Amino acid sequence: MEYKIIADGACDLYGENADKIGVQIVPFYVAFEENVYKKEGAEIEVRHFYKEMVENPTVFPKTSMPSVQDYVDVFTPIVKAGEGVLCICITTKFSGSYNSAVNARNMLLEDYPDAKIEVIDSTLNTVEEGIFVREAARMKAAGLSLEESAVSYTH
């Protein structure tokens, strides 16, 4: 079965870096003083995010995890196309992103009981999660199935 690799934005892979290895990113939301949350990497460039931090050192950004609906919106077309999903999330110690993805999976399994959706808590964050995601992409390119890839990360 063909499958897609999905990762949350905590892996720090955006744009060409994610596209090059065939990974779709579900972004986190960020806000500064105005409290308008924007999708990191999609609605606010990562470069702009860091520029805001440098130019306003006393203003601390707030973040919010991807919602269940964000994951449903990404998983649904993949499942409808008959493909599997391997979703890699930031450690549950830092975020509820994994729980959002699990809830989205459970919702989709109600309508698509044969869907193959694996959600993995990477137990990592930022660059380390990115390395984890790159390794998953390498394993997929080497021909490992969704199940083989998921098992290698959960055991």
Regions inferred by a protein language model and the residue ranges of each:
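N-terminal glycine-rich phosphate/adenylate-binding segment common to multiple enzyme folds
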Residues: 68-101
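Active-site histidine-anchored catalytic micro-motif
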Residues: 90, 96-150
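Structural beta-sheet core signal
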Residues: 5-7, 87, 119
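A short helix-to-beta-strand connector/capping loop
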Residues: 1, 21, 113-116
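Short, surface-exposed connector motifs at secondary-structure boundaries
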Residues: 57, 81-86, 115-116
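Conserved small/polar residues in nucleotide/adenosyl-binding loops
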Residues: 154-155
